[in-house]
Amino acid sequence: MKMRPRYSVIASAVSLGFVLSKSVMALGQPDTGSLNRELEQRQIQSEAKPSGELFNQTANSPYTAQYKQGLKFPLTQVQILDRNNQEVVTDELAHILKNYVGKEVSLSDLSNLANEISEFYRHNNYLVAKAILPPQEIEQGTVKILLLKGNVGEIRLQNHSALSNKFVSRLSNTTVNTSEFILKDELEKFALTINDVPGVNAGLQLSAGKKVGEANLLIKINDAKRFSSYVSVDNQGNKYTGRYRLAAGTKVSNLNGWGDELKLDLMSSNQANLKNARIDYSSLIDGYSTRFGVTANYLDYKLGGNFKSLQSQGHSHTLGAYLLHPTIRTPNFRLSTKVSFNHQNLTDKQQAVYVKQKRKINSLTAGIDGSWNLIKDGTTYFSLSTLFGNLANQTSEKKHNAVENFQPKSHFTVYNYRLSHEQILPKSFAFNIGINGQFADKTLESSQKMLLGGLSGVRGHQAGAASVDEGHLIQTEFKHYLPVFSQSVLVSSLFYDYGLGKYYKNSQFLEQGVKNSVKLQSVGAGLSLSDAGSYAINVSVAKPLDNNINNADKHQFWLSMIKTF
């Protein structure tokens, strides 16, 4: 039997199988795999920007102003002393000293020299380094300069949060306590990673230590908002399970004192044709801020509309675990590494024709994602991931009705990428551009396909309009930000989206003349009114610029409202 893109009783009966899901996707019939993919669009996390510079490294000498150009003398040698008055090797300062040694200098020149030495060490990771010109008698043109690199003194903790003191100590032992000196990159990493911990606010304070050249570190931690919840409503659902969706969720932080987080999300479409529940629990497990988490997801659906007579319904449950590590944390660059494992059980039924489909999918995903302040007032975001999957497929369909390439078991590999840039412009304007896509080594089951439509794709089409094995999306958006009311922001935008892809990686089983590629594009405008931590209202309208989807809507109107507590 060859695959046909038209609807038939037999096609509908076997469409829930892996290979027969090819005809299904061309027709737009949802199943557990495609519905899970649509929900994943809703679960996309907001992108985290780098914080920007944390510490001011300028080291202005207090002596520069009081030393005026006066008596000069020939400088023959500069001795650099540490805080124990021991001479240190100065090879790394040769490029600075050569501008002074062998020349006639004044006290003002020596002050400038000390300042240059301070700046050199501060720009080479010694955050509080200071070169001092101590009182001295200059003999035979030899000048002594005291170099204080900034030794770690006392580290004190003022913890008024639910975060464990033991965890903070372990985190400091892998950063600020790894050197005898206060190093800028380690202190920055400590500040950034501890502020990544949910449910806390942290601050650092440096002060002079008891000994010469020492600096004490005070760590202040207070509870932030540990409990939060939300309710939301939108019209982003599938037309066969219900356009309107109601969702609610809650999040609790620091239950065990190790930066753990528990999240619960519930969702139902109108008439309850689609129900979904998701739980995610994660906790930090070491002093390097590595996070281990477990997830569980349940979905139940029943189709209406054109597929109601088939009595199509199904359910799925997914169990997963993941490791997330902040590989690089600097003020202008973030890089995280994630490894996850998921086990999915998907069941679809068409009771009118007595067809039942079961699939079990085990997948291992490894990936990186990050952000970079590469350009002034701009942030670049990126991600790369590879998924290795194993599919076990069972169907009640008779062998003579199955398609030619039906395989009870198969392996597959999927590659995903994303690159985007957000640029702040003058007069409260901004411009966003992004590209993302997917490659696969073979034809995929519906839960692994890429959706070209929806709010994360070509916004002039519904999420299930085109589901492809390989595809690419380009999105551009021009925004304007306007403060309104007391704390709200109104964002207006114009956007253009373009997507293209291949329905099936392997097309040799398609009938001749059946089109395997698709291109979508749309333009639109949107408005968003929000108050961070309180509410958000988003409205957008998009119009397709193509006629490549049969019976496609003439436009899409997207609405979502969320209230947070």
Swiss-Prot record:
It comes from the Bacteria. Keywords: Cell outer membrane, Ion transport, Membrane, Porin, Protein transport, Signal, Transmembrane, Transmembrane beta strand, Transport. One of its GO terms (cellular component) is pore complex. One of its GO terms (biological process) is protein secretion by the type V secretion system. GO terms for molecular function: porin activity; protein transmembrane transporter activity. It is found in: Cell outer membrane. InterPro entries: Hemolysn_activator_HlyB_C (IPR005565), Polypept-transport_assoc_ShlB (IPR013686), POTRA (IPR034746), TPS_OM_transporter (IPR051544). Residues 73-150 form the POTRA domain. Residues 1-26 form the signal peptide. Likely functions in the release of soluble HxuA from the cell. Probable member of a two partner secretion pathway (TPS) in which it mediates the secretion of HuxA. Belongs to the TPS (TC 1.B.20) family. Probably a beta-barrel protein. This is Heme/hemopexin transporter protein HuxB. It comes from Haemophilus influenzae. The lineage of its organism: Bacteria, Pseudomonadati, Pseudomonadota, Gammaproteobacteria, Pasteurellales.
